[in-house]
């Protein structure tokens, strides 16, 4: 592939656009911002709609949510007991505890605390996007899966924004989500995308539950789980069913100079971008194309395409809201205690099938869809 | 003498490679000093942090793999210097050319790895493992 040089000054200082990129600035604004803005509607305003949605399609959810209390704690297995239980008005509604810090362009953590729970918007776009996005992720985990925050016990959701100088990344450091502003040329700020915020928070959940080792197949599964809950956060926030969902991770993260829609496509891995500078999205969509590499902890961000597609195919086959069926099955598998840190694709696939049987019965559409998903990507559950 | 820095990982999984021919630099002696000062044998494996970068720094006969948070002090000096004088390449040597597809249910179908001997990373287990 030809390697168009990236002018150094533009890499170092945002705002200077290389001439070859100027040639193809798309006139189309795309719909990035529309999607992101819609997803950033305030948590409170969305709540009634969400509960209706959830209640309608999965009657077990709403009572379950209200049985959570100091006595039932975070255990998602209490759902059955909770079915039909009266709502106890004395139990306070759980709420997120968000804490957003600002690294002010330095690579030091945590930075200065600039917005805590309940405080009004700061006017700093990244701070407010992180705050709102964390609210959406918290809502998915708490309202759908009954998990209050990363640890299930309402611990603060910590994030740092404006990390580094034109820093082209976002990560989970074991305690907090960290977001760079991007270089302005390839990447915009990493708080632009709800799916990215959900992805980072989900790394924390995985660390607290299945502890999938961040290397090779278990690492690709760790990445996959983060993509799953990142995508579901966006779908839940926007009320999208599996058909309407984009299944993209990081939509809106690339600048308009990049020929691409997002970082990854869960439904069609390998198709998210095809750009002169970045090259083509290298994700495999089938196990026969599994990439063996030493880089990227054994290709964790590449091979995650394989389980991602299995998940998305199962969701589309079932239709409706993915967070209510496949999302629930995956959450059960992740938190069920059967997975071990070094487990690979086959064992994970089996765990999702077992979770589907447990929740929906041996002969159910859900079990069939999950089995079909794994079969389509060449993974044989064991 | 060639210095190569490969940055992989990151949320986007994009890989960048910077290469510097030390002899072509205006100050080759400084580069040699910098490289010799690096604690090549003192790079304990760090627990990976999800989505953080991994750096692989090579200057024959040395090679070191560092987590982003280990790239401090003289390592950081070197990486900053390399990034200052070299343009990154996005060549993906590992995609397409080195894929060793493992067949589900047939672990022995996994081909031999063409990894540099200096790399201790084991091949990922076939799904039957
Ligand atoms: Zn990740």
Language-model regions, residue ranges each:
Chain A
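Zymogen propeptides/activation segments of proteases
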Residues: 1-195, 207-382
